[in-house]
Structure formats: C-alpha cells, structure tokens
C-alpha cells in the first residue's frame, strides 16, 4: 500500500498501482528476485514488451486500463478510438485547457504530473533514495565536475506511475544542452523496488542534461527509465530557446522518474511539500502547478 499526500484536499490517499501484486511478488520473494535479476531488469525484456505495445494489437489493452484506473480521457487530444497502439495512448498529449500553468514568473512549477519529493541543502554524497538507502550525484551522472555545482542545493524527484500523464516539460524559459545517455538496467521505480534495490537510480538507464533557465539558474535534469520503459524520448532541440511549459520529452510505457537539481540559493520549495517529504510521503502534483518560488536575494 502506497500512501501519498493530496495537497488540494490536505488528506492522505492510497495510490492505485498498476501490476501491484506482481511488483510486490517480484521484489519480495526469492523466486521473484531471481527472475528480476535474470530476466525482468534486462534490456531485452523491456525492448520486447515495448515492441508489443507499439503494435496495433495492443490497442485492446487500452479500454480495460482506462476503466480499471478510472482515467479521464476527455482531457486528452485523441479519443479512445483514435489511439493506434497502447503506447500511443500511454504517452498521449493533453488538450491545452487540461493543465494551467501558474502565471507568476517567480513561481517554480511542476514539470509534469506525479508524486513529488523535495530535499533542500543536499549532501551530494548522501542523496536519499528511501530511508536507509543513499547514493551520490557523481555516481548518478558520472560527471564529478558537473555534480559539484549542486553542493547544498535542492533536489526534486517526480515519480510518474503508469496511470499518470507521461510527458515532461520545461519549468522556465531558457536553453537546454544536449542529453547525455547512460546505459543501465530496467528496475521498477515503484517505492517497493526503491526499498529493495540499493542505488536504484544509479543502476537504471537514464539521461541527463543542463537547462540554462532564465530565472532559476542552471538546472540539472535527469530522466530515469524503469521496467518496460522502452524509450526516453527527448522532443526538444538542443541549444534552441524554449518557453516556460514547452515539452521537453516523454516516456513510453512504464513507471518513470525525473530528478531536478538546483544550485544553492536558487529556489525555495513550498513548505507543505518539504514537510510531507520529511514525514516520508510524496505529494501529488500536476504539470504547471506551483511547487516553490525563486529565491530572493537580500
């Protein structure tokens, strides 16, 4: 059971997890862990399933998925019959009216829909995965020089579960450098898996880039793939100016995670999100929603 904080109702909710029984069995039983290490975490397994979900025959999975998780397709650009495959449905675009971007330029907005954790004044060699498990930023991006820029900065972790909108966006205007790809495994990013696999983000396939934002400094963006995530698609053009809210990319099928690292004294996260993180709970947010503000120098 995964509890998260709904800041709109100020209550705790239970997440509906796609494939929950299978995830718990895989990461909690000896047989499941053996299968995980020999088959599930391998690229071939995710690539094959991704290939299937790109085929028209996978369309038959869409309607049961929508019904089971009570998804609102009225906010999607396409209707149910227009999706060419399950993946086409999975990384669906939303109507412009579906999400509103906080109008204040000093507001730090969420890059997408998902469950958010926030850590301030971070120790680069002791980043929190879950209580008791840590990793380092230089291990994560394999670039010690770049990692050192974010000493005592802020880290945001947005977890996208399979039922979420799976496109991610720029949180400010600016210019983004090309993405660096790092090969890796395909562990789940579900909290159950995060409690079982040490340095999971450093083990999984991932991509990172530096976004030179106009209002929040140089932001390190890291997209992490997961089980059955066939691809991390970057839809932006490197070195070209982007506007606040422009799409950066999207994930194909699977749960996924995006991490943002900010330099010291660039942002201040909303107190409720920081408090819930300290209590061990993620906060549910939507793309464009205010999650913090620009740090005002005195």
From Swiss-Prot:
Q: Give the pathway annotation.
A: Phospholipid metabolism; phosphatidylethanolamine biosynthesis; phosphatidylethanolamine from CDP-diacylglycerol: step 2/2
Positions of transmembrane segments: none
Quote the cellular component terms of the Gene Ontology held in the record. Answer: plasma membrane
Q: Where is this site: Cleavage (non-hydrolytic)?
A: 255-256
Cofactor note from UniProt? Binds 1 pyruvoyl group covalently per subunit.
Mind telling me which InterPro entries this protein's record contains? PS_Dcarbxylase (IPR003817), PSD-B (IPR033177), PSD_type2_pro (IPR033179)
EC number of this enzyme: 4.1.1.65
> How is this protein positioned relative to the membrane?
Peripheral membrane protein
Q: Where, subcellularly, is it found?
A: Cell membrane
GO MF annotation, one:
phosphatidylserine decarboxylase activity
Q: Identify which residues the record assigns to the active site.
A: 113, 169, 256
Q: Which UniProt keywords apply?
A: Cell membrane, Decarboxylase, Lipid biosynthesis, Lipid metabolism, Lyase, Membrane, Phospholipid biosynthesis, Phospholipid metabolism, Pyruvate, Zymogen
Q: Main site of residence?
A: membrane
Modification note = Is synthesized initially as an inactive proenzyme. Formation of the active enzyme involves a self-maturation process in which the active site pyruvoyl group is generated from an internal serine residue via an autocatalytic post-translational modification. Two non-identical subunits are generated from the proenzyme in this reaction, and the pyruvate is formed at the N-terminus of the alpha chain, which is derived from the carboxyl end of the proenzyme.
Q: Which reaction does it catalyse?
A: a 1,2-diacyl-sn-glycero-3-phospho-L-serine + H(+) = a 1,2-diacyl-sn-glycero-3-phosphoethanolamine + CO2
**Family label:** Belongs to the phosphatidylserine decarboxylase family. PSD-B subfamily. Prokaryotic type II sub-subfamily.
Q: Quote the subunit structure annotation.
A: Heterodimer of a large membrane-associated beta subunit and a small pyruvoyl-containing alpha subunit.
Q: What does this protein do?
A: Catalyzes the formation of phosphatidylethanolamine (PtdEtn) from phosphatidylserine (PtdSer).
Name recorded for this polypeptide: Phosphatidylserine decarboxylase proenzyme
Which source organism does the UniProt entry give?
Answer: Desulfitobacterium hafniense (strain Y51)
């Amino acid at each position: 059971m995964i509890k998260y904080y709904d800041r709109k109702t100020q209550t705790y909710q239970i997440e509906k997890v796609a494939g929950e029984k299978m995830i718990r069995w895989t990461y909690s039983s000896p047989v499941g862990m053996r299968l995980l290490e020999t088959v599930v975490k391998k690229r071939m397994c995710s690539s094959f399933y991704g290939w299937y979900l790109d085929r028209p025959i996978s369309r038959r999975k869409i309607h049961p998925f929508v019904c089971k998780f009570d998804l609102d397709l009225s906010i999607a650009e396409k209707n149910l019959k227009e999706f060419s495959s399950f993946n086409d449905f999975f990384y669906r675009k939303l109507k412009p009216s579906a999400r509103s971007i906080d109008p204040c330029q000093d507001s730090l907005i969420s890059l997408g829909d998902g469950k958010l954790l926030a850590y301030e004044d971070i120790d680069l060699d002791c980043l929190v995965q879950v209580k008791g498990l840590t990793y380092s930023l230089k291990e994560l991006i394999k670039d010690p020089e770049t990692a050192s820029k974010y000493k005592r900065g802020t880290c945001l972790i947005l977890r996208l579960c399979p039922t979420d909108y799976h496109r991610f966006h720029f949180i400010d205007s600016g210019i983004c450098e090309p993405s660096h790809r790092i090969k890796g495994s395909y562990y789940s990013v579900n909290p159950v898996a995060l409690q079982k696999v040490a340095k999971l983000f450093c083990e999984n396939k991932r991509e990172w880039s530096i976004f030179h934002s106009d209002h929040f400094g140089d932001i390190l963006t890291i997209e992490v793939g997961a089980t059955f995530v066939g691809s991390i698609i970057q839809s932006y053009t490197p070195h070209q100016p982007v506007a606040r809210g422009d799409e950066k990319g999207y994930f194909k099928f699977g749960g996924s995670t995006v991490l943002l690292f900010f330099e010291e004294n660039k942002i201040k996260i909303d107190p409720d999100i920081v408090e819930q993180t300290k209590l061990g709970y993620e906060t549910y947010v939507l793309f464009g929603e205010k999650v913090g503000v620009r740090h005002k120098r005195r």
